[in-house]
From Swiss-Prot:
GO biological process: ribosome disassembly
GO cellular component, one term: cytosol
Protein name: Translation initiation factor IF-3
Entry keyword set: Cytoplasm, Initiation factor, Protein biosynthesis
Protein function: IF-3 binds to the 30S ribosomal subunit and shifts the equilibrium between 70S ribosomes and their 50S and 30S subunits in favor of the free subunits, thus enhancing the availability of 30S subunits on which protein synthesis initiation begins.
GN (gene name): infC
UniProt cross-references to SUPFAM superfamilies, sorted A to Z: Translation initiation factor IF3, C-terminal domain, Translation initiation factor IF3, N-terminal domain
Cell location: Cytoplasm
GO MF annotations in UniProt: ribosome binding; translation initiation factor activity
Subunit architecture: Monomer.
Family that this chain belongs to: Belongs to the IF-3 family.
Domain of life (superkingdom): Bacteria
Cysteines joined through disulfide linkages: none
Naturally occurring in which organism (per UniProt): Proteus mirabilis (strain HI4320)
HAMAP family: IF_3 (MF_00080)
Length: 179
């Protein structure tokens, strides 16, 4: 029969009538090994149990099939995937901007923000921006970056520290220390 359309299944596992093997290695509802049986016999056992016959590993010889509730199997699988996704933490880079003339009060507020970011597990980018005549006093900027590094020594490790000024700013990247 030419030109016939085949419906392509989007499922990862073949179930019931989609299984093409003549013989299968069958596993029961509770995970007990039943052995190698014909496909017809396996389908009958699945029907008796009121469940589906699901092909677990199609590349094995003979293919391994399990009697199970396929809907429940998909639900459990999606649930575990969601749990794994929740556990993955996306590390963000948070930026805090300083100036060479940042006063003590502002410095403490910005330092508190840096501490909060690092405790949350995010990386912190410290940007020190120079304007106008401040460019002539780059050593003040280096002193400030060194002070920040010393104040956050027990919380963070320095990933990149500027040796010289880049354009009109110095950038230091801090990563939280592993506990």
């Amino acid at each position: 029969m030419k030109g016939g359309k085949r419906i392509q299944s989007t499922r990862q596992n073949r179930i019931n009538g989609e299984i093409r093997a003549h013989e299968v290695r069958l596993t029961g509802l509770d995970g007990e090994q039943i052995g190698v049986v014909s496909l017809k016999e396996a389908l009958e056992k699945a029907e008796e149990a009121g469940a589906d016959l699901v092909e677990i590993s199609p590349n094995a010889e003979p293919p391994v099939c399990r009697i199970m509730d396929y809907g429940k199997f998909l639900y459990e699988k999606s649930k575990t995937l969601k749990e794994q996704k929740k556990k993955q933490k996306v590390i963000q880079v948070k930026e805090v901007k300083f100036r060479p003339g940042t006063d003590e009060g502002d410095y403490q507020v910005k330092l508190r923000n840096l501490i909060r970011f690092l405790e949350d597990g995010d990386k912190a980018k410290v940007t020190l921006r120079f304007r106008g005549r401040e460019m002539a006093h780059q050593q003040i900027g280096m002193e400030m970056l060194n002070r920040i590094r010393e104040d956050l020594d027990e919380l963070a490790s320095v990933e990149s520290f500027p040796n010289k000024i880049e354009g009109r700013q110095m950038i230091m990247v801090l990563a939280p220390k592993k506990k």
